[in-house]
Swiss-Prot record:
The gene is FLCN. GO terms for molecular function: enzyme binding; enzyme inhibitor activity; GTPase activator activity; protein-containing complex binding. The record marks R164 as: Essential for GTPase activation (GAP) activity. Changing A445T: In a sporadic colorectal carcinoma; somatic mutation. InterPro entries: FLCN/SMCR8_DENN, FLCN_DENN_C_sf, Folliculin, Folliculin/SMCR8_longin, Folliculin_DENN. Phosphorylation by ULK1 modulates the interaction with GABARAP and is required to regulate autophagy. This is Folliculin. Keywords: Cell projection, Coiled coil, Cytoplasm, Cytoskeleton, Disease variant, GTPase activation, Lysosome, Membrane, Nucleus, Phosphoprotein, Tumor suppressor.
Amino acid sequence: MNAIVALCHFCELHGPRTLFCTEVLHAPLPQGDGNEDSPGQGEQAEEEEGGIQMNSRMRAHSPAEGASVESSSPGPKKSDMCEGCRSLAAGHPGYISHDKETSIKYVSHQHPSHPQLFSIVRQACVRSLSCEVCPGREGPIFFGDEQHGFVFSHTFFIKDSLARGFQRWYSIITIMMDRIYLINSWPFLLGKVRGIIDELQGKALKVFEAEQFGCPQRAQRMNTAFTPFLHQRNGNAARSLTSLTSDDNLWACLHTSFAWLLKACGSRLTEKLLEGAPTEDTLVQMEKLADLEEESESWDNSEAEEEEKAPVLPESTEGRELTQGPAESSSLSGCGSWQPRKLPVFKSLRHMRQVLGAPSFRMLAWHVLMGNQVIWKSRDVDLVQSAFEVLRTMLPVGCVRIIPYSSQYEEAYRCNFLGLSPHVQIPPHVLSSEFAVIVEVHAAARSTLHPVGCEDDQSLSKYEFVVTSGSPVAADRVGPTILNKIEAALTNQNLSVDVVDQCLVCLKEEWMNKVKVLFKFTKVDSRPKEDTQKLLSILGASEEDNVKLLKFWMTGLSKTYKSHLMSTVRSPTASESRN
């Protein structure tokens, strides 16, 4: 937990002071901190508790060395400190605890070594013992801001027979920059800090009662002659907390308590990345992967059986049998096993729109979204594959069936993206069909060479693209809503390519949710046609193109989702018995 725990004291001579603080260090300690100990002075060892190893390093400093440390410290000068304002002796390096589980160090000093942290702790100390006080001046309170951090403060009194009112004022503060985390930790911190305070007050009460029994200060003060002039009281008005509790190991114990408090509070609340339900694309990809693994297992089993039964064949025959034909390789590629080229010719939808032109791209995108067959004829296989890789981003994964490159025409039920070599003949009914679009790639004449809008990629300037269809999309046709939004995003030059990709993901998720509602409404609940029309108008998809798009995208729903909906349908007998 990134926090600082500090013990503060209100000195009658110097005001609010920080006595002791423990901070968390995630980075290695600076060179020289605790590494200059001589073997004779040694390191006192060390107690392991809860995965934390505590080192108490005591070094003997010369006066000159102590003075140099004091001058570089951001804390108050020695002349401004009394016995009650000081915790560790001059030259004491502090306490360090190593957490072996997380490689975190918990370091305790009288003041933080960093000037900015010292300022934050100093301000929190002053506020906790002056203006930010719980009613009754003893108890917990929360205050702070974004600039100086947020503070959980618990003020309390310690008995002192020589102090005004026989008690001194202290506070334990916890400082964090995360307000929500600190508020959620309030019950935990309150209980543990209250335990530390009770222990300190119990020790001080025993010392106070012993001193009162030996020399009652109340009787002595009552017998003192009254004078209207101010004078210094008898005894030491500035007593250290170690003398008030009669505990020489007080600071080591406080370091252990504060280090455990920081570790336990940080381990108590942890952040977890909560992902939502898997999208339809994720479910479809998982189903395809499972099918491929199942096929490979069955293929391996059948090969093993054939090897046991069949005789050994010559090498040439074996190689010929394992070679797949063009149709087989194309169909396997449609299952997602083909690898797109590393440097695509078409880089994005925006790039393709610049190359083809706005009217041709709109026609092509309309056919893609409607589920019609998209045929590319080109000698460049990489060009065709890059085009399909870009166009498939407009569809859900379950609606994509690709044959990247084939030497013969494949029917539309087998694929909606088909790559063909230029010499392949397309059937006449496909050429005149309104459910297909053909993109022919020809070598451009020198007179028709033109820039494609990308200075760093001139590979497409040698091509000419002709987009034809049996049912060209009219320029004044509204088209599906998602197509208009995609074009608006592509034409907005203020949006980068990455932002457009994320916008496309959001649009697909939006329309897949509409598809799920329509599927549940029509296929599962079997609602009448009138109710379906009302639902489509509510979804904002009552236009003809939107309805066709929803019906096509419905084929991309995962089997998992469909089976889940079907299994939750109540049988007529069960519903009648409930009624």
